[in-house]
Amino acid sequence: MVAIKNLFLLAATAVSVLAAPSPLDARATWTCINQQLNPKTNKWEDKRLLYSQAKAESNSHHAPLSDGKTGSSYPHWFTNGYDGNGKLIKGRTPIKFGKADCDRPPKHSQNGMGKDDHYLLEFPTFPDGHDYKFDSKKPKEDPGPARVIYTYPNKVFCGIVAHQRGNQGDLRLCSH
């Protein structure tokens, strides 16, 4: 009887551990802090933006598999501090995503479509999950502050990054 109770407790514990979402689980919510200009006060204010990983992954799957060859130039290469030969640019620190496909140095040919190319792409993603109009020319749709990062050519989800202020400047990994 004691053995059966212990077996039941072990099984219940295993089920609850397995049911908990992993950090890169599609059910994850990513939080990005972005400074946005308040039009009433004309001052920059921190905004907490929430992104669904499932919606961000969906955005990346709707994006064409190209590097800047659309009307909007998205998706395009996310250098992550590297040159096209996989050498780290002096003074740059790459973002660590915690996935081998995402963290390895890139190989990016001149046109971005070489047989052995592997690199990261960035594509706009939004809290409401709508798809970015990648073929919009001028005026192109506002890409917002956040980007879903994924691999070329196999579209492995790496994470969500965001600009710290508006939609300009360095990109930082959002928390999840």
Curated annotation (Swiss-Prot):
Pfam families: Ribonuclease
The protein's enzyme class: hydrolase
Top-rank lineage group of the source organism: Eukaryota
EC number, as in UniProt: 3.1.27.-
GO cellular component: extracellular region
Keywords: Disulfide bond, Hydrolase, Nuclease, Protein synthesis inhibitor, Secreted, Signal
Location in or out of the cell: Secreted
GO molecular function list: RNA binding; RNA endonuclease activity
Paired cysteines (S-S): C32-C174, C102-C158
Listed GO biological process terms: negative regulation of translation
Keyword Lipid metabolism among record annotations: no
Catalytic residue positions: H76, E122, H163
Keyword Secreted: yes
Signal peptide (from-to): 1-27
Family label: Belongs to the ribonuclease U2 family.
Role description: This purine-specific ribonuclease cleaves 28S RNA in eukaryotic ribosomes, inhibits protein synthesis, and shows antitumor activity.
Record-given protein name: Ribonuclease mitogillin
Annotated source species: Aspergillus restrictus
